[in-house]
């Protein structure tokens, strides 16, 4: 029975990759620009994202080791939802967007490496260690494909409707 559960984890991760990395908010720079942010402010917001990510990558990995992969994945989705809500609520307020970017970085940090580690451990426990690279490649393909799909879908919203992409992001995060 446990082996089936570990095999199930691998399949579930494909669904998680699909919904969690849809890429629907890929036009966030245009969104911020449409909401009154200058290029300088957008660059600063990007810096906040990457600085937060740099500072929190190792601590977020320690949380996964301390608690569980599942907990980190839940935290990732919750942070993604909160970040999207803040982006919608920002209405041109730099500081709200800054908080949203920091929380978005945490969302990526909580997922970064956690999915791969969970899939690897599940493959080992299910007796599929020798197939891990092909499983990992498949999941990477799902992730890349859905990011591309999300970008194409977001393209339909670029003329003043980019806020809808954050609602879609919230919905897909809830599904996950």
PLM-predicted stretches and their roles:
Residues 50-58, 144-148, 152:
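Residue-level signature of mid-helix packing/kink "hotspots" within the transmembrane helices
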């Amino acid at each position: 029975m446990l082996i089936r559960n570990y095999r199930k984890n691998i399949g579930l991760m494909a669904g998680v990759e699909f919904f969690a990395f849809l890429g629907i908010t890929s036009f966030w720079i245009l969104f911020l620009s449409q909401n009154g942010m200058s290029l300088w402010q957008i660059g600063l917001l990007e810096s906040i994202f990457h600085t937060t990510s740099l500072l929190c990558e190792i601590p977020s990995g320690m949380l996964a080791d301390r608690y569980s992969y599942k907990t980190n994945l839940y935290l990732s989705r919750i942070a993604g939802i909160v970040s999207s809500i803040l982006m919608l609520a920002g209405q041109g307020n730099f500081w709200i967007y800054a908080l949203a970017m920091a929380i978005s970085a945490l969302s990526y940090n909580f997922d970064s490496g956690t999915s791969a580690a969970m899939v690897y451990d599940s493959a080992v426990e299910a007796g599929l260690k020798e197939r891990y690279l092909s499983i990992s490649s498949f999941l990477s393909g799902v992730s890349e494909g859905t990011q591309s799909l999300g970008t194409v879908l977001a393209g339909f919203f670029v003329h003043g409707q980019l806020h809808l992409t954050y609602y879609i992001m919230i919905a897909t995060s809830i599904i996950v």
